[in-house]
Amino acid sequence: MREAMQLVPMVIEQSSRGERSFDIYSRLLRERIIFLNGEVNDTVSALVCAQLLFLEAENSKKPINLYINSPGGVVTSGLAMYDTMRFIRAPVHTLCMGTARSMGSFLLMAGEAGGRAALPNASILIHQPSGGFQGQASDMMIHAEEILKTKQRMTRLYAEHCGRSYEDFERGMDRDRFMTAEEALEWGLIDRILTVREGEIPD
């Protein structure tokens, strides 16, 4: 069962040189589309950062599209992706399809201003970072202080990217806050809700 779930579709293209096959993600990468699908961790972060850097090297002006369907995960892994998104010169447009929770929502709102979107039935969650530690009391206090610093840093970044006050997000992230696409738009996490593909005229 696990092997079946890990199957990746292949795409076959015809050219003057014959047939070429690509896994679907490599083919989409050629279209400057990166998928963040699943938990945020060091492995996923390394892959996404590498793809961002590769696409910037190919064209530093053309937008990169980051499609997000993630329950969140490791804060430091997410911050590595955030910093890379902000570091490269190519603008990164973000789109939530499915869910963007915790660090997933953080990366969603970190996209280029005007280029952050969600599909109509997307679910977005913001909350304060969490962590656990066992050990001596003095070490636990050090880790608690570090978590508090991370919370303050992330709250400030949410406020800056979303155009709201620090206090708004401090209150909003005190507990789990689930949002519809419409609520995420109101909070400034996204700039628009996509109901049709851009450039298409609805029936």
Swiss-Prot record:
Q: Which GO terms describe its molecular function?
A: ATP-dependent peptidase activity; ATPase binding; serine-type endopeptidase activity
> Where is the major localization of this protein?
cytoplasm
SUPFAM superfamilies in the record: ClpP/crotonase
Q: Where in the cell is it found?
A: Cytoplasm
Protease: present as a keyword of the record? yes
One GO process term, biological-process aspect: protein quality control for misfolded or incompletely synthesized proteins
Arranged from A to Z, the UniProt key words for this protein are: Cytoplasm, Hydrolase, Protease, Serine protease
Share what the entry says about its subunit structure, partners included.
Answer: Fourteen ClpP subunits assemble into 2 heptameric rings which stack back to back to give a disk-like structure with a central cavity, resembling the structure of eukaryotic proteasomes.
Family matches, as HAMAP family:
ClpP
Name of the molecule in the record: ATP-dependent Clp protease proteolytic subunit 1
Q: Which gene encodes it?
A: clpP1
